[in-house]
Amino acid sequence: MRQPLPEWMINLDMVGRQGKKIRIPAMTPQSMYRVYSRAIRELGYSPEEWGVSGYAILDDHVPFMERGVDTLNLIDDFQDGNWWHTSKDNIGILGEKSFQQTGEMTLHILRQLLPGPPST
């Protein structure tokens, strides 16, 4: 028996680089774009580090999106520098602040998407 698809999914890809520039794809569904934008605003994050790509990004989220799942792909701008898929693409480029912010962003988004405790 085939399992039902989720309503939404978040894909984290290459989010730990020092000096990261997280971009979501231009084709991100509006519902997920609003959640992402709200999180940036409420967390006070810089638009230099958190923004929207000017182009479509083919990544692990695409098969979900093609099946009607609202997707949010948080991905570092891999064209920013000459490290991607080279010998420079290693643990030495990772930064604690990048992981901290990405974790905070992800939790903030999840709090918006998941139902809260029942009202009494």
Model-assigned labels for residue ranges:
Residues 1-6:
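Primarily recognizes the serine-hydrolase "nucleophile elbow" in alpha/beta-hydrolase
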Residues 8, 15-120:
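Active-site-adjacent substrate-binding region
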